[in-house]
Amino acid sequence: TVTIIQYCIMLVVAATAFAFNFTSKKALKTLLLAISVIGLIIFCYMGYMRQSAETIFAVFPLLAVGITPILGKVVDNKGKAATMLMFGSILLIVCHLTFAFILPLFKGSAIGGVLIAYVTILILGASFSLVPASLWPSVPKLVDQRVIGSAYALIFWIQNIGLWLFPLLIGKVLDNTNPQVVNDLKNHVITPEQAAVSYDYTWPLVMLACLGGAALVIGVILKRVDKVKGLGLELPNVQQ
């Protein structure tokens, strides 16, 4: 029952955040934003009361669902796509390093650890909104219109390679940095459930932070190229 209620709250947050972009009435915009924020808080509180890891991870897409339409409207009307890409990359780095080094310091803290986990996962969701909301509208400005379909296909091709490859790499890094856990699991000293909470996830998280660093470098390069060649990445899509 609680899970169904949380799903309903998620739909309310998504709907109100999306509708926020398509109304010009200030009072209605404020009401929609308030409903979205209150729904998000209630969702997090219900997850905290359940004290389960999946409820924390379930928050990950929730803020992304809420703010992606808003960020898309910002890019359309204000521009700054390359800057948003860089900012999203910085948030990716900070969040993964927080999970790797700061969150373990609060192990055993029922309030502090859960609070940091929720805040970090929400910010991580926001970073996942910043990157696509700025990346996709920028593609037509970077490639010839005749090959724009191929450009999008190439992006998704590379993305799917990453979705296939990096879970394998993370698993390999996890095994190589936790040989004792792997041996205990192989010798049936511990169960897979016990192994999952015994692994040290520091290095896989550092690896993901490095990917954020690579994205930040690419963002800096794009902003530099845009400044030199005038591609219009920082300009709004809607010209007055």
Task: For the regions a language model picked out, list residue spans one by one.
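Residue-level signature of mid-helix packing/kink "hotspots" within the transmembrane helices
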Residues: 61-69, 160, 164
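Helix-to-loop junctions at the C-terminal end of transmembrane segments
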Residues: 20-22, 67-80
